[in-house]
């Protein structure tokens, strides 16, 4: 299985493999009674809704998605902080994941993020943006010059034989990186819930929205129920 959804100018999320389906959590829950369904029925939907509504989440950790994510380094830093935050909170129920990232010690970076516009700093929220910078052309020139200088210096260092592990340290956070991320349904929904909301950075919101679309495709019934119970009520 391989489906690629584009994000930003050069990024994407590629689904490599999926473990389980909409029946997986309800059958996992029924194991206590030795029951098992072969087709997803209205009865299964009611059980799945009950499990989600009453926060019986362990059955939803049997559904997994393996994906390749290509994103700017500043987006991936936020993403990994989310993953690590889950992992190190001992009483949090969503620790299940695997994360492996491409290494600049072995490969040369070539893709860099270029935004469509340049946002202004919010006056009310120190970590958010609001509206656009008045001088868009000037901002673009500064962005391009800073990025070009870093890239040219990086390439020259590689040409002169400098170790990649050292030369990469001057690259801007706009450099695109790649990771393999395998996570449970519950872990992914937790990420979407926290990152597809107005106070998150715009770029990571875009990845969260694409991820939501992917989940509606691979686990349609379970995702719709989760959205109905937790997200639609908040809107």
Segments (PLM) and residue ranges:
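Family-specific signature for flavin-dependent thymidylate synthase
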Residues: 1-235
